[in-house]
Amino acid sequence: MGTRLALYLGLGVVAVLVRLLWELRFAGAGSYALAAVAALAAGLWAIQGKPLPLAWLGLAIGLAGTVAGYGLPWLSLLIPLGVFVGYWGWARHVSEKDLGAFWGWALVWPAVGLLLVWQVIPAFYALWLSFLDRFNFIGHSRFVGLLNYEILLTRDPLFWKAMGNTFWFVAFTVPIGIGLATLMAILLNEKVKLQGLFRTLYFLPYITALTAAAAVWDWIYNPEFGFLNWLLGTPGFQWLSTPEGIFARILRPLGINLSGFWAGPSVAFVAVMAMSIWHFLGYQIVVLLAGLQNIPKEYYEAAELDGASWWQKVRFITWPLLSPTTFFLFTLSLIGAFQVFTQVLILTPTGGVLQDTLTLALYLYNKGFRDSNFSYASALAVVVFIMILVLTLVQRRVLERRVTYEA
Amino acid sequence: MRLKPLLGQITVYTVLIAGSAIMAFPFYWMLATSLKSPQEAQQAVPVWVPERLKPANWAAAARLGAQGGSMWWGGYRAGRSVVLRVYTGEKGPEPVVTIPTPPAAFSDPRADNTRIETAFEDGWWEVTLTNGGQESFRLLPVRLRIAKSYPTYRLELQPDSISSRGEDWELSWSNLAPGVLGYVLHNFREAWYAAPFGRYFFNSFFTALTQVLGGLFIAAMAAFALARIPFPGKEFVFSLIIATLMIPGEVLLIPNYILLSRLGWLDTYYALIVPWLASVFGIFLLRQFYLSLPQDLFDAARIDGATYWSQLWRIALPLSVPGMVTYGIFTFLGAYNALLWPLIVTNSPEMRTIQLGLQAFIGEAGSDYGALMAASTLSILPIVLGYFLAQKQFVQGVARSGIK
């Protein structure tokens, strides 16, 4: 027997999951009955050979759970519970290997079950939704194949606006953030006094909630009474509602007129980026500092003996040996850029003037929860998913080759 | 690494100090604004030290607060009199004192039941406000008009705003009997009363803590099985868990919203907690910890007849406390700071988390930046306090996340 016990447990849990799917209207009563009967049959099979009273009791509890589960879904939990009652009787008669099989599954099932219900199945469900026409809570929707994708990719300027913004977000925040963080981390790693205090100050923004942080920056950016306008001597400048691209703004005095994508991110979006860099910098510094402290001191000592300058040491020892950490941060920031939401919502609640601060996450929120167009939003989510996947793979292929993993 | 001694050192410290000043400035500005009156917050030239932080005003605030209610939190209780002195030197036109009524109110018991007496003493006007009604009040807002013909005048408690009205100056206090704490923390108290922040805090703490504890329990079980128990199908389970890592959060927003609505769980604590209970990050982190423990420990326990369950509870868990702390901090931070998910799955004010409450408050507070910054400060306070208490764990946890 042995693995039979794990099978019995597994089918019991599956029966509960199917009961849940029935409740969610993804499965019918028939499939629940099938799963429950399969679980009980596996139970009978497991009992074969060693019919103990407790095992029969467990089976009886499972049977009761199956029946009760018809009315009250959560009572179907009695089915796996019955397995444990049975196990109680069996435990002494079971081999070491079989015990492992049973306990292994018993311990991973809660996590696996939750991941299945809240992550794996929903991911496929999102894919399915994206093939429907205007799915929401009202009325029926029909299967339209790739229509949503076609509209999204070929006829939706806002999607491309959001894509462009995401591109600029990555192009600005990632190099500037990682560059600044590397500089600060290298300086902090010089035996400075008060290192702890500096680290505390740099790290503080990262643990502050984005909502509160964005509220403060909104106040700093305030056109009339904001600190920034006082500091720069630009009273009344509308930091958060100037849709003009920054490249266009910089180059206009030279007689160069840029428009569309090449005008660059709007002033408002750059203000959002500045706030985002500030927020995330402490995290990058702490991670890089840990990376720096992992570099063996001997390299520097050897370099010093050879008369290397400070810059040479940074360029030829620190930078290459820090590259795995930098790569990790790069990947993380790239994925993070696709999820920028909170600071945009607080700083420019409507997505800015002319949607100039629209990000993919904000667009998804607007489509899904303001326009209640779940299918279109799902199509958007799937596209984002594929893009992240492709980017991560490309990154692995192209960038990771330049990463020095071994010292 | 050693820089060229002196010049290098100076450069390093200059850059570090400048950088930390920029990093810390928004916090200072939030705190400073949260202690300012509206007029002070809206100065063309920034006010670096708010009036409410000056000890000279505290004594007056305490005295006036004690007259109206208590020395600490002030008030305007039934039967009490609050006396304001306006030092003018000579006797000129009598200052006019009124209690402003809130706009769109039919009657204001505070203004109606207050007796105002003005008398000139030796070089000062003594204005006495007596609460003749049965009702006690938290605040005593007062407006005073004083003729511009006085060359100078001095007040015990600095007014919150001064504006010009024809021949007069109009001075106003949002609370003339504040008490020390009521004076300094005026915006905090008003923000606290303006929205149910207590409830918001409870929701945030409750959901975040449940997520941490439940998630820890589930992740520890799975991680232990994956690290220490040989069982058929282990590789499959492991690759399933790795696969879920690739699913970005955005993909799950809509389907999970629909699932929750079909379960009837929208706008409940379940919606805030259950979908994020199983954490792949936690499973990986703890599995790494359990793998680093020596196998002998578990073999010894097995020989002594310990089941897998008690191996998990008696050996693996106590030895992986640092990992659990890291996981706990991250999960708590994530749950406490989240805005998007609570925004989607809750809609009644009772279910709002603190971030959502703050977001709603931003809409309501309008241009009252003092109250807004006070609310922001309140919302980050628990995390910042926790950070200062457990700084090492925070920083190590983050550092650990970056090293493979």
Predicted region positions:
Chain A
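Transmembrane alpha-helical segments of polytopic membrane transport and secretion proteins
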Residues: 1-12, 18, 22, 41-58, ...
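Extended hydrophobic/Leu-rich segments
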Residues: 11, 17, 34, 39-40, ...
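Alpha-helical transmembrane segments of multi-pass membrane proteins
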Residues: 15-22, 117-123
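Short, flexible coil/linker elements and helix-boundary hinge sites characteristic
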Residues: 24-27, 49, 98, 233, ...
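Alpha-helical transmembrane segments of polytopic membrane proteins
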Residues: 27-38, 72-82, 171
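Hydrophobic, membrane-facing alpha-helical anchors
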Residues: 33-41, 124, 352
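A structural signal for multi-pass alpha-helical bundles of membrane permease subunits
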Residues: 100-407
